[in-house]
């Protein structure tokens, strides 16, 4: 089911069931693909790089467990060997080094943690001007990261911190501004639902925020990565969360998040990393951002 085939089912009163049933990886209908092709055309004029993506978000995005190991280590793909081409496609392009740990001798889209992925951040924080690096003074953090990388895709997830400070409607306004900045730079914005947060009073707020994220994706013809559904799937212990009940879990030992075999996929960060690769693979195959089709 294409996102836009759902009609206008998402309102401020949307029930949880409406967004919970959306697929993990978006089915890109013709309206969405048409919109994304226009974004890509704009990006080509700006010199954006097909094999580069940006990571924009809070601690769940800035974590060393999110994609960084794929920068220089081979994952255990298990049943997901069809992702190897996409894994290599987005790993081949060098990008400026970010704040990541020095675990990779090269810097690519996987290993880089840039200026728009910061622990504790809310969507509004990514819109604030940065004092550094010097070439980005006065620019919002999101715009700075896009200027530094010229990416074709941006993986965006905010909301985990926002739900403690803002209403769902206020959050959607800020996330919409982030997505507009990204698309205006010729970069495809992928918006993501946030993971479960079972402790009260947050579980109901997660549902409201995710309904707004889904509504934004539908109304703006954006790809929606339903990360929540990965985490809430049957058989995932503790809904994929670590001991703090907020951040995804990691398989320890060996403390890896790139084992995509069944045992590894019982942990939240492995699910998140696999989801990211699947989303990137879908975009590469169905939107002309490289050699995928």
Regions found by a protein language model. Give the residues of each.
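Bacterial N-terminal signal peptides
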Residues: 1-9
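Boundary at the C-terminal end of the N-terminal hydrophobic targeting segment
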Residues: 11-16
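Conserved SGNH/GDSL esterase-like catalytic core that processes O-acyl groups on lipids
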Residues: 25, 46-170
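Loop/turn elements at helix/coil->beta-strand transitions in domains of secreted/extracellular proteins
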Residues: 49-52, 149-155, 183-190, 220-223
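Active-site-proximal beta-strand/loop segments in catalytic clefts of secreted hydrolases
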Residues: 56-60, 156-161, 192-197, 226-231
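Short, solvent-exposed loop/turn and secondary-structure capping segments
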Residues: 64-68, 166-170, 194, 201-204, ...
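Active-site segments of SGNH/GDSL-like serine hydrolases
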Residues: 160-163, 178-211
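Catalytic His-Asp segment of secreted/periplasmic serine-dependent ester chemistry enzymes
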Residues: 197-293
């Amino acid at each position: 089911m294409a996102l836009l085939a759902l009609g206008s089912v998402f309102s401020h009163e949307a029930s949880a069931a409406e967004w919970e049933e959306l697929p993990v990886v978006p089915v890109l209908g013709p309206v969405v693909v048409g919109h994304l092709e226009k974004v890509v055309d704009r990006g080509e004029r700006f010199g954006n790089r097909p094999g580069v993506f940006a990571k924009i978000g809070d601690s769940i995005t800035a974590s060393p467990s999110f994609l960084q190991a794929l920068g220089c280590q081979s994952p255990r793909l298990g049943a997901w060997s069809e992702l190897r081409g996409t894994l290599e496609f987005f790993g081949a392009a060098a990008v400026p080094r970010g704040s990541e740990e020095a675990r990779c001798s090269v810097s690519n889209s996987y290993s880089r943690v840039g200026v728009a992925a910061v622990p504790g951040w809310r969507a509004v924080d990514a819109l604030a001007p940065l004092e550094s690096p010097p070439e980005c003074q006065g620019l919002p953090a999101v715009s700075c990261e896009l200027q530094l990388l010229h990416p074709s895709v941006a993986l965006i997830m905010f909301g985990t911190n926002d739900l403690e400070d803002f209403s769902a409607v206020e959050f959607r306004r800020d996330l919409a501004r982030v997505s507009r900045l990204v698309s205006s730079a010729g970069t495809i914005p992928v918006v993501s639902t946030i993971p479960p947060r079972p402790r009260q009073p947050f579980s109901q707020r997660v549902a409201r925020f995710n309904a707004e994220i889904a509504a934004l994706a539908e109304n703006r013809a954006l790809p929606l990565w339903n990360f929540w559904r990965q985490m809430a799937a049957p058989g995932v212990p503790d809904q994929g969360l670590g001991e703090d009940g907020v951040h995804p879990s990691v398989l320890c030992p060996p403390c890896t998040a790139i084992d995509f075999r069944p045992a590894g996929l019982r942990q939240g960060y492995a699910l998140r990393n696999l989801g990211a690769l699947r989303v990137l693979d879908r975009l590469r195959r169905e939107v002309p951002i490289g050699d995928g089709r």
